[in-house]
Amino acid sequence: MNDEYSQKAKREGYLARSVYKLIEINEKFSLFSYGNVLDIGASPGSFSQYAYKKLKRGILVAVDINDIGLRHVDNFYFVKGDIFSDDTVFKINTLGPYSLVISDAAPRTTGNRLVDTSNSFNLSMRIIDLSLEVLIKKGNLLVKVFQGGDEIQIFKKFEKYFKFVKKIRPKAVRKNSFEIYFLGKSFGK
């Protein structure tokens, strides 16, 4: 799709239009602080591109089952793997802990909204559970979720572990998309 955000991403050297969702959320809620950043579901790499620019005395770890279009530079590590795999989780833990976990991950879509939202829910819950293991106290978490009914459970889980919780639909989300983001700030209440 060649819309305003896709064209802007190309002009500004980002790998995907999705970066503008992260930029908008960060400008409103100041996600980045000192420390390590974990990007789950990093492919094609635009969230990682932006996160790398925002790093403050830490490392960026990008994780995905697919390769990403970024060169390996200082303080950047790419873990190719599935977050449901013990080996991948071990690598993530070895490089942590993290002050911020961001995720624009989405399951492979089928076109069946019920199936897609269910798969998104399961993936989101896994990302949250993993984040709870690797976040430092007062760390932040941003996760993409497909709306479909079960997202209230995700919101409640965020409320249980974070001082500040917000459901966000950035302007860069396509009109026909049912994706939203959940933000949790200040882990460990």
Curated annotation (Swiss-Prot):
Query: Residues that bind S-adenosyl-L-methionine, according to the entry?
Result: 45, 47, 64, 82, 104
Q: Kindly provide the name given to this protein in its UniProt entry.
A: Ribosomal RNA large subunit methyltransferase E
Question: What is the primary gene name for this protein?
Answer: rlmE
Task: Specify the domain of life of the species encoding this protein.
Answer: Bacteria
- Enzyme Commission number: 2.1.1.166
First-level EC class: transferase
| Catalytic reactions of this protein | uridine(2552) in 23S rRNA + S-adenosyl-L-methionine = 2'-O-methyluridine(2552) in 23S rRNA + S-adenosyl-L-homocysteine + H(+)
Active site, UniProt feature: 144
Extract the SUPFAM superfamilies matched here.
S-adenosyl-L-methionine-dependent methyltransferases
Cytoplasm as UniProt keyword = yes
Q: What job does the chain carry out?
A: Specifically methylates the uridine in position 2552 of 23S rRNA at the 2'-O position of the ribose in the fully assembled 50S ribosomal subunit.
Q: What family does the database annotate? A: Belongs to the class I-like SAM-binding methyltransferase superfamily. RNA methyltransferase RlmE family.
**Would I find Chaperone among this entry's keywords?**
no
Q: Where in the cell is it found?
A: Cytoplasm
What GO MF annotations does this protein's record show? rRNA (uridine-2'-O-)-methyltransferase activity
Query: Which cellular components does GO assign to this protein?
Result: cytoplasm
Q: What is the lineage of its organism?
A: Bacteria, Pseudomonadati, Spirochaetota, Spirochaetia, Spirochaetales
Which keywords, in A-to-Z order, does the entry hold?
Cytoplasm, Methyltransferase, rRNA processing, S-adenosyl-L-methionine, Transferase
